[in-house]
């Protein structure tokens, strides 16, 4: 088994810098190589430098939302919500549409003997 690992890791077995794809069920599946030890700390690493600028951006967004909320309150007194609801509703039909039942077409066919 150790011989197989040495053969696979040799530069001759590598294609384009990685292991060749393996066929499984008629489809090619790539084998992922890498150290699990190296990838785990990157996922769990805390990025405090990126959190600080985002918190500043969040504060500016919150201030902008407060300004907009004040403007919306002024507009709500000028234009009531009931008028907006009526404008967005579908118009009621004056004549109701009559739905005809589907016709069943029975084809008379002779019985099998």
Swiss-Prot record:
Q: Which GO terms describe its biological process?
A: apoptotic signaling pathway; cellular response to amino acid starvation; negative regulation of autophagy; ribosome hibernation
A Pfam family that the UniProt record links to this protein? DAP
Organism's domain of life? Eukaryota
Record's keyword terms, sorted: Translation regulation
Q: Does the keyword Hydrolase apply?
A: no
MF (Gene Ontology): death domain binding; ribosome binding; translation initiation factor binding; translation repressor activity
Show the segment(s) annotated as Disordered. Answer: 1-53
Say which family it is in: Belongs to the DAP-DAPL1 family.
**What does the subunit section of this Swiss-Prot or TrEMBL entry state?**
Associates with ribosomes; preventing translation. Interacts with eiF5a (eif5a and eif5a2); preventing translation.
**Any idea what job this protein has?**
Ribosome-binding protein that promotes ribosome hibernation, a process during which ribosomes are stabilized in an inactive state and preserved from proteasomal degradation. Acts via its association with eiF5a (eif5a and eif5a2) at the polypeptide exit tunnel of the ribosome, preventing mRNA translation. Plays a key role in ribosome hibernation in the mature egg by preventing mRNA translation, leading to ribosome inactivation. Ribosomes, which are produced in large quantities during oogenesis, are stored and translationally repressed in the egg and early embryo.
Q: Which PANTHER family match?
A: DEATH-ASSOCIATED PROTEIN 1, DEATH-ASSOCIATED PROTEIN-LIKE 1
Q: What is this protein called?
A: Death-associated protein-like 1.S
At the highest ranks, the source species' classification is: Eukaryota, Metazoa, Chordata, Craniata, Vertebrata
**What gene is this protein translated from?**
dapl1.S
